[in-house]
Amino acid sequence: MEHYISIFVRSIFMENMALAFFLGMCTFLAVSKKVKTSMGLGVAVIVVLGISVPVNQIIYFNLLAPGALAWAGFPAADLSFLGFITFIGVIAALVQILEMVLDKYFPALYQALGIYLPLITVNCAILGGVLFMVQREYNLMESLVYGVGSGVGWMLAIVLLAGIREKMKYSDVPAGLRGLGITFTTAGLMAIAFMSFSGIQL
């Protein structure tokens, strides 16, 4: 149990997708104007990462990895070259399902997210989570914990940034820094703050 807690905490703080690896910055910067919208997108990212990482773990280590098809009588088969297209296909299918669910049951959130919801398909934080799972050879349970933890970490980062940006609306920001300038500066300072977690050994 401690091992899974360690993976979960590390994926949120020490290995934060947005602030440690700078993945998913497109939606991270574009949708972080309002806390409510950021939370909605964050939940969507948690769902997609929490499902796509373990699903891709099953597919990769049982079908695509070198020697994975030994159970079918093909011990020398290596289909790992199909990894990228398979991972992206699974992610795209999950995002499409999520989009239909939001459109039907949460139309206000669906409208608020707009074009950024289908952009989760090409959000490199999602693919990054899957590729880190493959690189670290996580088992199914570790993949589930890592996927959910990475999603929670990304959501935490975007909600924090959105909260700061909402407060900055009432601040006297210098003209040259208004807009993306102050947003990049704020994100950089947040990343430096999250670096303080890197010294913690779990």
UniProtKB/Swiss-Prot annotation:
Segments crossing the lipid bilayer: 11-31, 41-61, 81-101, 114-134, 144-164, 180-200
Location, primary (coarse class): membrane
Catalytic activity: a ubiquinone + n Na(+)(in) + NADH + H(+) = a ubiquinol + n Na(+)(out) + NAD(+)
GO cellular component: Gram-negative-bacterium-type cell wall; plasma membrane
E.C. number: 7.2.1.1
GO biological process: respiratory electron transport chain; sodium ion transport
Protein name: Na(+)-translocating NADH-quinone reductase subunit E
A Pfam family matched in the record: Rnf-Nqr
Enzyme class at the top of the EC tree: translocase
GO molecular function, one term: oxidoreductase activity, acting on NAD(P)H, quinone or similar compound as acceptor
Subunit structure, as described in the record: Composed of six subunits; NqrA, NqrB, NqrC, NqrD, NqrE and NqrF.
Family label: Belongs to the NqrDE/RnfAE family.
Role noted for this protein: NQR complex catalyzes the reduction of ubiquinone-1 to ubiquinol by two successive reactions, coupled with the transport of Na(+) ions from the cytoplasm to the periplasm. NqrA to NqrE are probably involved in the second step, the conversion of ubisemiquinone to ubiquinol.
Membrane topology recorded in Swiss-Prot or TrEMBL: Multi-pass membrane protein
UniProtKB keywords: Cell inner membrane, Cell membrane, Ion transport, Membrane, NAD, Sodium, Sodium transport, Translocase, Transmembrane, Transmembrane helix, Transport, Ubiquinone
Location in or out of the cell: Cell inner membrane
Source organism superkingdom: Bacteria
